[in-house]
Amino acid sequence: MSSPLIQLKIVYWGPGESGKTTNWKVLKNHPRISRLNFGMSVETTDGRTLWQDSIFLRFDLNIKADIDRYILVTQLTTATGQERFLSTREYILSGADGVVFVADSDPEMMEQNKRSFRELLNFTNTLKIPYIIQLNKRDLDNAISINQFKNGLEIPEIEQDDQGNQIVYEAIAINGKGVLKCFRDIVGLSLYDFFNQK
């Protein structure tokens, strides 16, 4: 008997050049992740995401000590960070089961981080989509402190929320640091919602 199928859509959201496509490429090329297709990336002539990056990934999911087995297919997609393409971002977010907000550690990008985060909250608050925050580019010499970043986004200066979920994930996506953990955790939150809404 074949295992039942679960399908999720995970969207990477954030300001332009914060590292969404870099996260996507790291996961797409990860040796322990099975791809169902080669992926699609629509870019401008200068290499920036015009529409979206998208790929389908497959996982075998075991729950309750191998009693319940599922096939998990995850559509991993990025929303362009360019502000002139706002309407495409809302379209890409439709049907999402979880979102990774990718922020830039450069202090000069804080206004763009705030604008993009507010925009995301406007969409996710009505849809009740779980999200996590990845603070990327932690290797920058002038990287903003975690507390300054949290204050700027008006999020609590605590490590975890009431359910024990991490508030901000540090990452250096260009070398893969923190990328897999963010992905695993947003898939976990999305699956929790999936099973509790059945």
What are these regions (language model features)?
Residues 84-88, 178:
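Short acidic active-site motifs
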Residues 98-101, 124-139, 157-170:
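Conserved beta-strand/loop subsegment of P-loop NTPase cores
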Residues 36-84:
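Switch I (G2) and immediately adjacent beta-strands of P-loop GTPase domains
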Residues 79-82, 95-116, 125-127, 138-143:
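Conserved Switch II/interswitch segment of TRAFAC-class P-loop GTPases
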Residues 1-42:
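Conserved G1/Walker A P-loop phosphate-binding module
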Residues 141-198:
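Canonical P-loop GTPase G-domain recognition
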Residues 3, 47-50, 61-69, 90-95, ...:
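Conserved catalytic network of the ASCE P-loop NTPase/AAA+ motor domain
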Residues 113-119, 147-151:
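Charged helix-capping and loop-helix junction motifs
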